[in-house]
Each structure stands twice: as structure tokens, then as C-alpha cells.
Amino acid sequence: MLLKELSSLASPLSQSQVDKLKQLTAELNSVQLAWVSGYLAATANTSGSAIQVAASVTEAQAAQTVTILYGSQTGNGRGIAKALAEKAKTQGYSVNLASMGEYNVRQLKQETLLLLVVSTHGEGEAPDDAIELHKFLATKRAPQLNNLHYSVLALGDSSYEFFCQTGKDFDARLSALGAKALLPLVECDVDYEAAAGQWHADVLTAVKPLIQTTANVVALNEINSTSAQVASESEFTKQNPYRAEVLVSQKITGRDSDRDVRHVEIDLGESGLHYEVGDALGVWFSNSEILVGEILAGLGLAADAKVTVGSESISLKQALIDKKELTQLYPGLVKAWAELSASSELLALSEDKEQLRQFILNHQFVDLVTNYKLPAEANLDANKLLELLRPLTPRLYSIASSQTEVDTEVHLTVALVEDEHQGQTRFGGASHFLASAQEGAEVKVYVEPNKHFRLPENPDTPVIMIGPGTGVAPFRAFMQERVAQGAKGDSWLFFGNPHFEQDFLYQTEWQQYLKNGDLTRIDVAFSRDQAHKIYVQHRIKEQGQALWQWLQNGAHLYICGDAERMAKDVHQALLAVAVEFGGLSSEAAEEYFETLRSHKRYQKDVY
């Protein structure tokens, strides 16, 4: 309908609004008008996806649009994708940027330029927001993509067996469907920044011959979750963390417990940092001076030797304390050390994937230094040592508080990683740092949003929370938030740990929630308080009929904790409940929980 006719019809717009609309549209060209119409349509339909926002641009300028999709359990993939989109925008490209979870898979056959950033979760699994697209590409419904040029940047951790597996899957499947790779697959380890930056440059160079730039019609379209928007507004990020103050680091396991679990409270002060329940806190830490001293002594290197890290000139000791990863091994380092030490034992071990995986889980760099001495001809000096070690990376902790309850504080539940090996005690880097922190100590932090672990929008929706050990942390935050909301929905907690008397984390809080009626029920499993071990998965099966009824009544289901064993065992228990009490086949049970996941009713925060 023509704008000049608006005022003469029964329009919901006032005359002033019509005049403003006329003034705006008079200044726009046809492509810009298409973009505005798509934007307004998406605004009117808030349930729409990021691709709906960009639909008009895609139709008007399909051959000139670069689509950038990201799939990531944390914010790393989104950060890389967004930085690429900004660079493409400055070069005059029209860009559609979206999470894979918000992308309409039916749009794929219309794409001509597609750039993917995707991480691998768990044991070779796609992250939550990439699952649908990942599965779609593996089905017969996936279209031929002969007109598509693409590139994939895969994020992973070489400490795990299925390194960058999801990225490999996307690359292989797109190629099989006829798409043409702009570049070979780029695989990034945890120190991904340099490789990602190089990919940005390379892929934009590769795109250039295929696209005509039109700087005046650039469109960068993205719909972000609320948490991502809030977090991005803060000046404090992973690269620029806030220097916060430790208020409390208190042991909350008993004196006779085999585990040292700390309740840590941190003051965010005037930082303006905001978090939602379900988010994580990124913690930068310093390695132990004792550990660094042991490494330097074992290598015969001077602590005060001057080295350059980035643009900074510091002592070798300080570089090892603040800049390099010392407490987590990875395959590349073990293999490099095997060659330097010429150890036949270590060389053989590095060629056996399973043995190497177990070795990495149970050793630190100092164990290589101590047990596999370097010959003089290895000639390892300070600079070569730093080249061997990858950069220190922050650790993520599920936040155990709600800002509606604690205001400018953030609470964590931290298990001290502590292992005895050959008569030596080895500590985890971040957990030891936080456990040792005194009141008033400085800690560098930032908020890592996790849109895949969110309470239901309706506070009257029932929730089932499964969190053994420190996996209970986000559920403490959930309960604080639900109480503040005045939630009427039922809530059910499954918790487990070795001993009732020593390891019942936040026991008095849960009892108070029960007494007040905020927590409807709690089922606990203390594995070593009886002859036979009982875990949360056993309690789930025991309460299967009630749990199934809760799910039929619309309950949202949450799991937090260990991904290696617990999450898998709990999932199997849930499948058994669906089979026994829902009358489903094994295949139908899997489909049932997949449907719950796709509707955000089955969410995991596992590590």
C-alpha cells in the first residue's frame, strides 16, 4: 500500500507517525526498504528467528550476502563469528549473522556464501544450538548445494579424543552435498585466537572474487538473547576482565570429608557486570609459585631470565605464573616432550590414543619435567620452553547465585582438584587459586552467558534439577531466582555426594527451602553411606513414576555436573523411566527427550 494513502484509511498509526514514516522511507533505496520491511516484520513477530530479520535482504541481494553461522556451548564461537561479521561489514559486504539454533534450515539451499564457526561438545557431540542443523545435513532431506561456497572454523580441545569432530562433520557433509570449500577446514585448539584471526583474513580474501561489495547497503543482522546483549554492554570481557575482590572462600564439606569444596563469594563492585542464573563466571588465575619453582629447578633454568610474551618483557618465572598453562596437559605437548627427551616409553605412549588420554588426565607438565629428563642436546632454553607451552586460559564456573538475591556479588561452588601422584600432591590451577585466596584478594573475572541453561519464562512451570556434587551450584541460583519471582511452580532437586554428614552441600539452605514450600521435594543419594553404592541415577529410577508424571505436566528438566560419566548415566536412567512408565520403545524414548531438548525443556550444563 502506498504511504500517501495511509492517512486516508483506518490506520493504527497517528498522523505524526505517518509523517515520520514518509520522511524515513523517502531517504531509502530499494534494498534498504527491503531490509526495513524484513526488520519490521521480525519485530512484529518476536518469536521469529535471526533469519526472518534478514529475509528481505536475502531475497533482494542473495548473491551478495555472506551468511555467518555459529554453534558454540560457550561464547567463544559467537565472539569469533561476530568479529568476522564486523570485519566483513567494514569491507562492504552484506552479512547475515545468526546462531545455528536460530537458523531456518530450509534457507540453506538459497545460500551462496556460508561461513561456519562451530565447537565440539562432550565426546564429539554438536553443541546445543548446532544440533538441529547438524542432524539435518545428515538426512536425506538435505538439499544439493552445488551453488554454495563455504568455509568451516572448528573449535575444540586436543586433550579430548574427538578433537573438532563437529567441525569435521560439517565440512565433510557440506562437501558431500556438492558445496565448494573456500579453504581447507581450520581446526583450533583452546588457544584459538591466532588461528581464528588468520582464518578471518584468509576467508575474506577467498570471498572477495565471488562477491560485489556494495558498501552503502551493508546489513549486519543478528538477534541476540537477552543475556548476550547485557553481557556485551559491559566493558569487561574475557580479554579485559574485571579485577574483583574475594569476599569469602569457605570450606563447606566436613573436616573428615575426602573432598575440599569451597563456597566462594566475589564482589563485582561498580563493574556493572550483570549475569543471569545459568550463566558461568570466567576466572583468570595465577599458577602456584611452588609449582613454577619446581619446574624451573627441574629444567635448570633461571627464574629471572628475561623473556618476551606478546609485547611484554618479563621474567621467566612471571611468565610461567601468569601466562602459561601448567596444570593441564594436551597431546601436542606430550608428543613434543617425548621427542625432546627421546624417551621410548613416552614415545610409545604418545602413539596410543587411549593410553595418552589417561596419561593426560592424571599428569601435569611438572610430571614430564620430573620423570622424563631432557638430555643436554635438547638445548631447551627459556624462549623454547615458552614456545612449547600454550597460553593460560580462564576456567568457567557455573554461577551459584542470583543477582536478585546477592546484588553486586557472585557466588561459586568450587571443588579443589587435588591428586596424589608418586608421593606428590598436584593441584588444579584455578581451584587451588580460589581455595587459597584470602579475604580481599584480587581475582580477574568476566561473565560468560549460557543461553542453553535457562529457567522457564513462566515461573509457574515446574522444574526438575539433577545436580550431584558441585553440579548443584546453578540450582542454588535457580532457587534464589524462583523465590524472588514468587514462583508457584513445583521444584524437585536430585542431589548426590559420598557422605551425608560430610558432603551435603548447602544442606541448611535446601532444608529451609523445603520448610518454606519453595522446594517441593528433594531426593538424595549418598553413595558411600551403605555397603552398595547409590547414585542419583538410582534415585531417578526409584522415583520414575512421579518423575514421568512431572514431565507429562510440563516440567523442565536440568542436569549439571560431570559429562564423562554422570550425565550419561542420568540420561540412561531417564530413558529407562520413559520406557517403563511412559510405555515408549527405546527409540521413541530417545526421540521424546530430543523433542524436550528442542523445546528447551531438557537442558544440560556439563563439563
From Swiss-Prot:
Keywords: Amino-acid biosynthesis, Cysteine biosynthesis, Electron transport, FAD, Flavoprotein, FMN, NADP, Oxidoreductase, Transport. Residues 239-456 form the FAD-binding FR-type domain. PROSITE patterns: FAD_FR (PS51384), FLAVODOXIN_LIKE (PS50902). Residues 66-204 form the Flavodoxin-like domain. It is an enzyme of class 1 (oxidoreductase). One of its GO terms (cellular component) is cytosol. Its cofactor is FAD; FMN. Pathway: Sulfur metabolism; hydrogen sulfide biosynthesis; hydrogen sulfide from sulfite (NADPH route): step 1/1. Pfam families: FAD_binding_1, Flavodoxin_1, NAD_binding_1. It catalyses: hydrogen sulfide + 3 NADP(+) + 3 H2O = sulfite + 3 NADPH + 4 H(+). NADP(+) binds at residues 527-528, 533-537, 569. Component of the sulfite reductase complex that catalyzes the 6-electron reduction of sulfite to sulfide. This is one of several activities required for the biosynthesis of L-cysteine from sulfate. The flavoprotein component catalyzes the electron flow from NADPH -> FAD -> FMN to the hemoprotein component. Belongs to the NADPH-dependent sulphite reductase flavoprotein subunit CysJ family. This is Sulfite reductase [NADPH] flavoprotein alpha-component. It comes from Shewanella oneidensis (strain ATCC 700550 / JCM 31522 / CIP 106686 / LMG 19005 / NCIMB 14063 / MR-1).
